[in-house]
Amino acid sequence: MSLNGVAAKSCTCLAVQADGAEITTVEGLAKGGELHPLQEAFWNKHGLQCGFCTPGMILASHELLRTNPDPSEDEIRHALEGNMCRCTGYQNIVRAVKEAAATMKGGAQ
C-alpha cells in the first residue's frame, strides 16, 4: 500500500498508524477503468503469475518511478529487494518496470 504517498508494508502497519492517512492500494492506481502503466506493463511482460507478490511489486515500483523516472536495472532490483517472488524469477518484473518507465515518459520500449 501507499501511505501518504510513500510505499509501506500493509502487513506491518497498525491501523492506528493509518488513521487519517491517505491510503492507496494497487487497485487504486487504475483510473477510469484504465490500468495504470505499471499494471499494464506487468500484464504485458508477464511480471505476474500467482499474484501473491504483485501488489507489493507494483506499489514498490510505483514509489521508485515517482522518485526516479528512469531507473537502471540495478536500481529497480534494489527497490524491489524487500518483495519476494517465487514464480517469475524477477527478470520479467524488471522488464515490466522498464516498460512502465518508458510508457510514463511518453515513449515505448
Regions found by a protein language model. Name each.
Residues 1-109:
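Signature of N-terminal electron-transfer/Fe-S-associated modules in redox systems
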